Amino acid sequence: TATPTNPFNEQLVSGGSSSGSAVSVSRNYCIGSIGSDTGGSVRIPAAWNNLVGLKTTHSLIDLTGTLKLCPSFDTLGPICKNVDDTYFLFHGMKKRKFQKLKKYKVSDFKFLIIKNMFFDSIDSEINDSFNSVIEKIIKNGAKVEYKSVSEIDNAVEISKIVFPAEAYGMWQHEIEKSPEKMFAPIKERFRSGQHILAHDYVFSLQQLFEFRMSFLKKIMSFDAILAPTSPIKPPRITQLIDDHKLFTEKNLLALRNTRIANSLNLCALTLPTQTNFSGLMLM
């Protein structure tokens, strides 16, 4: 089936590989759906359809019966219109006994905003929306700190080796059996893992584990990290089809912020804001 268009503007894309899940909720076909998130494919469709999307902690939800992309990063999570429905569906996926969602005051929390990377090349409307939300949070008593964290940059660089190595390793036979059937920019992304050596992959994965531990030590005093879910709004479909270079550029930029949570093995939640396509991500 074809990728669905965006319900809020049919000239725009609706998200990543779980876009069908998000559009189904946005168009009221269901109250909730399930998506997969390896680098942002629950959170980007949720944000670009003004929905709530939860990227769960790696290995928390059983992946039996799913098609793997990158086993070290693959997760499943719910997409719904509000937090209550998301919480309910998450409990069903986890097979937990449902417990009533606790209510907290914003003033109970201490948030971190990481200055490096998350705001590079950000759309002005997305940036304004994020700053507006932060102003409201501070006004309501929350503590907010800004700081740079080097592990963010390190983890993203390392993931450029680990992601393609695993993805090509999982799908090489299907791709090379009929390469002409695959969208060229995506095929080349997969093939970028073709020549990564096993010892480089193992070393990079070990480095990533070390960066994760170091990162967690630095953020332990905070309740959550706040960031824009994506630095850009959904692009026009025709632009991406006609310009493969632009497709790759927009695809990588759209997923840049969300992939950080996957690389560092964080759970992450995107919430809709008052601005269309401008999700607020908590990690």
Which residues make up each language-model segment?
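Gly/Ser-rich, acidic/histidine-flanked active-site/gating loops
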Residues: 75, 92-161, 182-183, 195
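Short glycine/serine-rich loop segments
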Residues: 1-90, 262-274, 279-283
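Small-aliphatic-rich amphipathic alpha-helix that forms the alpha element of a beta-alpha
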Residues: 216, 248-272
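Short helix-loop capping/hinge segments that flank enzyme active sites or metal/cofactor-binding pockets
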Residues: 108-110, 162-216, 228, 267-281
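Acyltransferase
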Residues: 124-148, 172-177, 201, 205-222
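Conserved acidic residues
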Residues: 31, 223-225
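Short glycine-rich anion-binding loops that position phosphate/pyrophosphate groups of nucleotides
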Residues: 117, 230-233
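Short, surface-exposed loop/helix-turn segments at secondary-structure junctions
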Residues: 4, 202-203, 234-255
